[in-house]
Swiss-Prot record:
Stretches the record annotates as Domain III: 157-205
SUPFAM superfamilies in the cross-refs: DNA helicase RuvA subunit, C-terminal domain, Nucleic acid-binding proteins, RuvA domain 2-like
Keywords for the protein's UniProt record, in alphabetical order: Cytoplasm, DNA damage, DNA recombination, DNA repair, DNA-binding
Family affiliation: Belongs to the RuvA family.
GO MF, any single term: four-way junction helicase activity
HAMAP family assigned: DNA_HJ_migration_RuvA (MF_00031)
Primary localisation category: cytoplasm
Annotated stretches, region: Domain I: 1-64
Name of this protein: Holliday junction branch migration complex subunit RuvA
Function, in words: The RuvA-RuvB-RuvC complex processes Holliday junction (HJ) DNA during genetic recombination and DNA repair, while the RuvA-RuvB complex plays an important role in the rescue of blocked DNA replication forks via replication fork reversal (RFR). RuvA specifically binds to HJ cruciform DNA, conferring on it an open structure. The RuvB hexamer acts as an ATP-dependent pump, pulling dsDNA into and through the RuvAB complex. HJ branch migration allows RuvC to scan DNA until it finds its consensus sequence, where it cleaves and resolves the cruciform DNA.
Organism of provenance: Shewanella sp. (strain MR-4)
Length: 205
């Protein structure tokens, strides 16, 4: 199992990155908060990883901290939650917000995330309550927040920052009209793509 990578960041296009480790390029997918903490391209970086083997693919998921990876691993053990949905959840709300949803039985907030229906949200609330409590107690004081991102194909009259933001929202499962509307409403002159993605995602939760 590949548990950690240390190398040079070659490419990054949310939520995917490419890291060169001694001449071998590793492709990873990351939740947005981890993605935003990466250095600039061609700089050294270290990420913790979770390796998934499927019949049709071998996938690596990357995280800046072990805590993020632990939460991801708890999520994919829940019924109806695979790696893709777990990544979307971790990209869509902070760790404290997710714990808060579980503690409050807040189905309304959870179902706003793409791919999370009512039944899935109900299962998460039941299955994650005790598991999350243990995880958060083990990491008091070191809690990191997660940000939501998705991918969407660009609308014809948007600038590059808006195109990147829409594309990111689409990758998380938002519909093109949702992504376009959220990005357009959140955009302010001079915003870079990362700031715009965060603002657009926040407006949809």
């Amino acid at each position: 199992m590949i548990g950690r990578l240390r190398g040079v960041l070659i490419e990054k296009q949310a939520p995917e990155v490419l890291i060169d480790v001694n001449g071998v390029g590793y492709e990873l997918q990351m939740p947005l908060t981890s993605f935003y903490e990466l250095p600039e391209v061609n700089q050294p970086t270290t990420v913790y990883t979770h390796f998934v083997v499927r019949e049709d693919a071998q996938l690596l998921y990357g995280f800046i901290t072990k805590k993020e990876r632990s939460l991801f691993r708890l999520l994919i053990k829940a019924n109806g939650v695979g790696p893709k949905l777990a990544l979307t959840i971790l990209s869509g709300m902070t760790a404290s917000e997710f714990v808060g949803c579980v503690e409050r039985d807040d189905i309304v907030t959870l179902v706003k995330l793409p791919g999370v229906g009512k039944k899935t949200a109900e299962r998460l609330l039941v299955e994650m309550r005790d598991k999350l409590k243990s995880l958060m107690e083990a990491s008091v004081g070191s809690e990191r927040e997660f940000v939501l991102q998705s991918n969407y194909s660009p609308a014809p009259t948007v600038n590059s920052a808006e195109e990147d933001a829409i594309s990111a929202l689409l990758s998380l499962g938002y519909k093109p009209p949702q992504a376009s509307k959220a990005v357009s409403a959140a955009y302010k002159e001079g915003m870079d793509s990362e700031t715009l993605i965060k603002a657009a995602l926040k407006s949809m939760l």
